[in-house]
Amino acid sequence: YSKNHRFLIEIFKEFHAIKNNSVLLIIGTGDMEEEIKNYAKKSGIDDDIKFLGNRNDIEKFYQAFDVLMLPSLFEGVPLVGIEAQFADLPCFFSEKVPTEVAFSDKTNFISLNQSAKEWAREIANVDISHRDSERSILIKADYNIQTAYKILESKYYELFELI
């Protein structure tokens, strides 16, 4: 539910209308997996959506991806978003993803109030032709374990205050 898969599929459907050779890869499983697969089928684009299940080797996929989309309804610090930025992927997060996660100039925050078509247009306008190495991204971002620790620590404090 929190990952907003229905909206993700709607975005992809609009994006696929712009770039018809695109494929959506969904990694992970959950209680709503069958419902999400059925929704993809009803949307008429299930042939262009691949459900890869749980993976322990997601880092191997980053070089094959063109973008990462997280139109989440709520989110902590998404490690997948950090990893994708290390791989120099353009990332599209909803405004519900903490802005502290962003350290790349290819990180975009889009409101969930925008339509799937608007999301798709923004994603389609991104230049995916040039990607830097992980090392140069880390140097540019000054990203290190201390930075990651501070982000996680602040999130834990925020959660603790809610209890």
Indicate residue ranges for each PLM-predicted region.
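Aromatic "clamp/platform" in nucleotide-sugar-dependent glycosyltransferases that forms part
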Residues: 54, 73
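A structural motif in glycosyltransferase catalytic domains
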Residues: 8-11, 24, 119, 152
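A conserved mid-protein helix/loop that constitutes part of the nucleotide-sugar donor-binding site
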Residues: 1-14, 31-37
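Short hydrophobic beta-strand element within catalytic cores of glycosyltransferases
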Residues: 90-94
